[in-house]
């Protein structure tokens, strides 16, 4: 391509509003709810997430919710039942219920090996969740990370466990960055923001064509 390229997000729906963040002096809750969302398939790598939680220092305090459907559902449920200290919820959630589900969480983990835009990560950030995202050459999701503690090498179970423990150990940072991610997402990835960028792109293209 010889023309200028513009990358514009699909955007997220305005019903994904941010949750109320905890006060800076509040400890991490027990149970500490980790939310993941996506197809229950190999490339989404929820197996790594379950294994990582099992290796966390705070494993006994963590509750896992994975919203999605797919061929690995029963395998993931069996694995979670065997490895995790608390019962996990793994399965279908209505789209209408997703904003409330995300707001009920404390941390968003996206362990996927392969992705396109990862709208589920955008929706989680819009809801005020700090993301912990797999850094993968086959996924675009890593671009959403605003600090190192939001990234881990793809499929590195021990690194993911350390990231999860770090956020549980630092509740003030979790609250601060939850608000930061929500504001950043609203500014850069809302449908309104995407429309503005698209209109600006069209105007630029028209102006260039007239030269």
List the predicted regions and their residue ranges.
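Aromatic "clamp/platform" in nucleotide-sugar-dependent glycosyltransferases that forms part
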Residues: 113
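A charged, aromatic-enriched C-terminal amphipathic alpha-helix characteristic of glycosyltransferases
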Residues: 172-204
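Conserved donor-binding/catalytic core segment of Leloir-type glycosyltransferases
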Residues: 26-44, 50-53, 65
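Conserved acidic donor-binding segment of nucleotide-sugar-dependent glycosyltransferases
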Residues: 146-157, 166-171
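Short alpha-helical donor nucleotide-sugar binding micro-motif in glycosyltransferases
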Residues: 92-93, 100-105
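Short hydrophobic beta-strand element within catalytic cores of glycosyltransferases
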Residues: 130-134
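Carbohydrate-associated surface elements
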Residues: 11
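Nucleotide-activated donor-binding/catalytic signature segment of Leloir-type glycosyltransferases, i.e.
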Residues: 75-93
């Amino acid at each position: 391509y010889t023309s200028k390229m513009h990358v514009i997000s699909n955007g997220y729906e305005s019903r994904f509003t941010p949750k109320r963040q905890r006060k800076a002096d509040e400890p991490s809750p027990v149970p500490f709810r980790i939310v993941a969302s996506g197809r229950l398939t190999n490339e989404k790598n929820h197996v790594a997430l379950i294994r990582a939680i099992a290796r966390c220092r705070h494993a006994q305090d963590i509750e896992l919710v994975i919203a999605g459907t797919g061929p690995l559902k029963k395998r993931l449920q069996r694995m979670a039942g065997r490895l995790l200290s608390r019962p996990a919820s793994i399965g279908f959630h209505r789209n209408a219920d997703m904003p409330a589900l995300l707001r009920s969480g404390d941390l968003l983990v996206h362990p996927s090996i392969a992705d396109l835009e990862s709208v589920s990560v955008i929706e989680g950030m819009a809801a005020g969740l700090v993301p912990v995202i797999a850094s993968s050459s086959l996924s675009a999701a890593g671009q959403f990370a605003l600090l190192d503690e939001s990234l881990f090498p793809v499929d590195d179970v021990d690194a993911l466990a350390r990231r999860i423990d770090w956020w549980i150990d630092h509740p003030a940072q979790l609250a601060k960055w939850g608000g930061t991610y929500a504001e950043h997402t609203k500014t850069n990835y809302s449908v309104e923001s995407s429309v503005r960028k698209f209109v600006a792109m069209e105007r630029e293209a028209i102006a260039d064509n007239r030269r």
